[in-house]
Amino acid sequence: MRVFEVERTTNETNIKLRLNIDGTGNYEITTKIPFFDHILSSFVKHGSFDLSLIAEGDLEIDDHHTVEDVGICLGMAMNKIEKKNIKRFGHAIVPMDEARAMVSIDLGGRPFVVGNYIPKRDKVGELSTENIVHFFESMANNGNMNIHFEVIGENEHHKIEALFKAFGIALDNATQIDERKGIISTKGVI
């Protein structure tokens, strides 16, 4: 079983998480940002991970540090995965009513994010929509992963939720074990 724990404390946040890559979609998530909890739960459920996450942040200022640092910690956990015999690449397309999200991932050690999500409103619940892309940047930079995504739709809730579901499915695909593969790189290392 591939289980990774990360604890990170700064002057802005205190985060503790336990991530089981080979889980079944169970979660206990508390960030005190209800919509963020909701989309993280969707990510976990559709990625078939198990996640225990407690995040305390300086929400009296805003939600930026909490969202960013959760992305950092999830990336740190993902970066602990043994790269030998994983599929490395994953992708998913998820519709949600009028919205659709497409995500492609490479766990090849090259952090980069390319995406087209541009929010049409400032917040969904208490979550600042401008932090969505920053969450993925934080996760990519600390998880050494390449993330590409495209989102279409009208409803911000639907677009964001479809994106997190697709991200979970793509990440699940990329982390699957394939004994035939070895290290998936012509360099011989990731």
Swiss-Prot record:
| Reaction catalysed by this enzyme | D-erythro-1-(imidazol-4-yl)glycerol 3-phosphate = 3-(imidazol-4-yl)-2-oxopropyl phosphate + H2O
The organism's superkingdom is given as: Archaea
Compartments (UniProt record): Cytoplasm
Check the record and name the Pfam families matching this protein.
IGPD
The alphabetized list of GO BP terms reads: L-histidine biosynthetic process
What coarse category fits the chief subcellular location reported for this protein? cytoplasm
Q: Which UniProt keywords apply?
A: Amino-acid biosynthesis, Cytoplasm, Histidine biosynthesis, Lyase
A Gene Ontology molecular-function term? imidazoleglycerol-phosphate dehydratase activity
EC number(s) reported in the record? 4.2.1.19
Q: Which SUPFAM superfamilies match?
A: Ribosomal protein S5 domain 2-like
User: Which pathway is this protein engaged in?
Assistant: Amino-acid biosynthesis; L-histidine biosynthesis; L-histidine from 5-phospho-alpha-D-ribose 1-diphosphate: step 6/9
Mind telling me which InterPro entries this protein's record contains? Answer: IGPD_sf, ImidazoleglycerolP_deHydtase, ImidazoleglycerP_deHydtase_CS, Ribosomal_Su5_D2-typ_SF
Identify one Gene Ontology CC term for this UniProt entry.
cytoplasm
The top EC class is lyase
Which HAMAP family is this protein grouped with?
HisB
Q: Which NCBIfam families match?
A: PRK00951.2-1, PRK00951.2-3, PRK00951.2-4
Q: Which family does it belong to?
A: Belongs to the imidazoleglycerol-phosphate dehydratase family.
Protein's recorded name: Imidazoleglycerol-phosphate dehydratase
The organism is Methanococcus aeolicus (strain ATCC BAA-1280 / DSM 17508 / OCM 812 / Nankai-3)
